[in-house]
Amino acid sequence: MAKDTELDRKFFTALGQRIQTLRKRRGYSQEDMISFGYTVRYWQRIEAGKPITLRTLLRICGILGTTAEAVVRGLGPEAVKRPVRR
């Protein structure tokens, strides 16, 4: 069970980093996310690896103009064992 928890933590950390990269590529600041209904603090937590629901992921993907499939591609168990490159 602890192994699954560690993989979950690594997955959401990698997911948060990927969301942050996409946000920056689209030219949005964290403050810009307020207009989409997210507080800066909540957005910071997502990008820091806070677990999110599928519904939240889909909403974020809509905002960032991508798909959930594209965002999570490569974030399987093998990927989250390696450090994320920037």
Regions inferred by a protein language model and the residue ranges of each:
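Short, charged recognition helix plus adjacent turn
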Residues: M1-K10, V72-R86
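A short, Lys/Arg-rich alpha-helix, primarily the initiator
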Residues: M1-R25
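Helix-turn-helix DNA-binding elements, focusing on the entry/boundary residues of the two helices
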Residues: I19, S29-Q30, V40, L54-L57, ...
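Short alpha-helical DNA-recognition segment
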Residues: R25-Q44
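Short, basic-rich loop-to-helix N-cap that marks the start of a DNA-contacting helix
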Residues: G49-G62
